[in-house]
Curated annotation (Swiss-Prot):
Belongs to the DEFL family. The keyword Disulfide bond applies. It comes from Arabidopsis thaliana (Mouse-ear cress). Keywords: Antimicrobial, Disulfide bond, Fungicide, Plant defense, Secreted, Signal. Residues 1-24 form the signal peptide. Disulfide bonds join 40-80, 47-72, 56-78, 60-79. It comes from the Eukaryota. This is Defensin-like protein 199.
Length: 84
């Protein structure tokens, strides 16, 4: 009985491991990623102190790559993003 119970527990853990591995695996490029393309442009003029995401977004939309929006990071650089 103990060998059967031990085998059953090992089998159940093996099944859980296989399911979690397959479930978290990426099968296509870009799947599961928040952004496909990111470009950070340094420039204090686009990200004033205390934010400035609106000015950054305006700048990013004017670029040739037509980014969707911009976000100011902690060093006041404007990072432009394209949604997936």
């Amino acid at each position: 009985m103990a060998i059967t119970m031990r085998t059953l527990v090992a089998f159940v853990f093996t099944i859980f491991f296989i399911i979690s591995f397959v479930h978290s695996r990426t099968t296509t490029s870009g799947y599961g990623m928040l952004f496909d393309s990111v470009a950070c442009e340094g420039g204090f003029e686009y990200c004033p102190r205390g934010g400035g995401n609106d000015k950054c977004t305006t700048f990013c939309r004017s670029l040739p790559n037509k980014y969707d929006f911009g976000v100011c990071d902690k060093i006041y650089a404007c990072c432009c993003h394209i949604n997936v």
